[in-house]
């Protein structure tokens, strides 16, 4: 038990953020119910089956310096199973593949002049030395990068890289985004590691999530899968949650981990100004193609694409990181299409996505044949990450909502990092003290109350 009263918590959303929040609250002695609309936990980190292979639905990697992810892995007795690998990085520029995996290869990179290379390196170094990231929130990322790198390097390198993650939304994104990206790359040095390495768990994130779910159950968390939430409301000191099965349950405290655009729909009692702030947050979406191939495309884990005629925004060859035995000896690649949440790409059929993807691969890899394709699937997610627009952190709605007993903890609150599993877990961990403080100060009952079914 803790110094707070035992309360009944509802966590809405069973991604890694919701799972971590549920675990920590349960470990503090509270009763926790975790609601998830899909048939499995994990959210963006969940697994699916591609042909005869089960692996992550979206591409993920763990860095040696990802301390929050590794803390969870240690709790699940999985950290010692991690495999750590040095990977190579490629650039597809001017119709050719180039390796950019070492300082020497960077110096030999012909598409950039020696001066441009110097300015590019200086930009990254300058970004790594910035301590107060908030100063960058008032400047567009394109303006900041052109100031340091010059227009030519921006057009040749930075702009395609920005578009690979942000699409046309890069035009409204603040320079804090690139600071966070550079900070993640320099995390290893800041934590005293000699070099950064990429890691994977044999069995993928699906294995971690399976163990995580068991850990939650052992901690006493009540997991409700296939339960969409229709509404959340406050009445007479309790928070009532109505699910898709028309059942209404009362809790002492509720935490929403859903995207901000969903919050006002679930919470009609939210103050108008607060609801408007949630609605104003723009999200970047993704159509993420998974392909199982008979053979590898190249030996690069990530290939950044700077040619505008390729439809997808990068090539991630997971089998350049993960031992091919995990994929029955085949190659697993991801082709991301990062697009705004209202983009027409979400209406493309699987056949249309497949054809575009195959044409793109044929334009990049002369040895690629359509006969190499073993299996194909496409994941579509409209709200992946919030766009860090100008002065983004100043416009965020508070975590503690205007509705008593209801909190929002979602990835839109990641203001000084990039969206990844480590930052998601970090967000959950940092939210717990505030959740407990509010619970302690609330007018919760002196003795535990059973969940009320209405």
Q: Residues of each region from the PLM?
A:
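N-terminal Rossmann-like FAD-binding beta1-loop-alpha1 element of flavoenzymes
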Residues: 7-34
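Internal hydrophobic alpha-helix adjacent to the cofactor/substrate pocket in enzyme cavities
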Residues: 424-443
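Short FAD-binding loop at a beta-strand-to-alpha-helix junction that anchors the flavin cofactor
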Residues: 333-334, 398-417, 423-427
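Dinucleotide-binding Rossmann-like beta1-alpha1 core, especially the glycine-rich loop
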Residues: 51-133, 160
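Active-site/ligand-binding neighborhood in enzyme catalytic cores
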Residues: 112, 122-235, 250
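Glycine-rich FAD pyrophosphate-binding loop
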Residues: 26-50
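Conserved Rossmann-like nucleotide-cofactor binding loop
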Residues: 17, 40, 261
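Mid-domain catalytic core of redox enzymes
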Residues: 227-347, 351-368, 379, 393-402, ...
């Amino acid at each position: 038990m803790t110094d707070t009263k035992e309360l009944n918590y509802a966590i809405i959303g069973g991604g890694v953020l919701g799972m971590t929040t549920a675990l920590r609250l349960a470990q503090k002695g509270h009763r926790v119910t975790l609601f998830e609309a899909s048939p499995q936990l994990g959210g963006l980190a969940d697994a699916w089956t591609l042909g005869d292979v089960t692996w992550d639905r979206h591409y993920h990697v763990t860095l040696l310096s990802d301390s929050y992810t590794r803390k969870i892995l240690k709790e699940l007795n999985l950290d010692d199973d991690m495999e750590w690998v040095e990977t190579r990085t490629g650039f597809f520029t001017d119709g050719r593949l180039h390796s950019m995996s070492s300082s020497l290869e960077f110096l030999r990179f012909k598409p950039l002049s020696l001066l441009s290379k110097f300015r590019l390196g200086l930009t990254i170094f300058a970004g790594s030395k910035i301590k107060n990231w908030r100063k960058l929130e008032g400047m567009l990322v394109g303006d900041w990068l052109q100031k340091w790198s010059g227009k030519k390097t921006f057009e040749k390198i930075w702009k395609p890289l920005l578009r690979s993650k942000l699409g046309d939304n890069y035009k409204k994104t603040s320079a804090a985004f690139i600071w966070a990206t550079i900070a993640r790359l320099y995390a290893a040095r800041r934590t005293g590691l000699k070099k950064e390495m990429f890691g994977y768990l044999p069995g993928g994130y699906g294995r971690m999530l399976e163990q995580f779910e068991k850990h939650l159950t052992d901690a006493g968390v009540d997991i409700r899968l296939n339960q969409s939430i229709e509404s959340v409301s406050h009445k007479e000191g309790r928070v009532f949650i109505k699910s898709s099965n028309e059942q209404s349950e009362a809790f002492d405290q509720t935490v929403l981990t859903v995207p901000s655009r969903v919050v006002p729909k679930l919470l009609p009692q939210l103050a108008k100004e607060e609801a408007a702030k949630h609605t104003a947050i723009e999200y970047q979406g993704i159509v993420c193609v998974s392909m199982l191939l008979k053979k590898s495309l190249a030996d690069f884990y990530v290939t950044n694409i700077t040619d505008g005629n390729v439809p997808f925004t990068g090539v991630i060859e997971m089998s350049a990181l993960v031992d091919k035995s995990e994929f029955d000896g085949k190659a697993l690649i991801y082709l991301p299409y990062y697009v705004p949440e209202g983009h027409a790409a979400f209406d493309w059929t699987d056949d249309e996505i497949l054809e575009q993807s195959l044409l793109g691969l044929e334009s990049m890899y002369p040895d690629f044949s359509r006969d190499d394709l073993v299996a194909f699937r496409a994941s579509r997610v409209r709200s992946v990450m919030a766009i860090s627009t100008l002065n983004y952190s100043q416009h965020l709605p508070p975590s503690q909502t205007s509705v008593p007993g209801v909190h929002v903890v979602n990835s839109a609150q990641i203001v000084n990092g990039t969206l990844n599993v480590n930052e998601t877990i970090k967000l959950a961990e940092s939210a717990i003290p505030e959740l407990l403080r509010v619970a302690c100060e609330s007018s919760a009952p002196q003795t535990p109350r059973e969940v009320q079914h209405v």
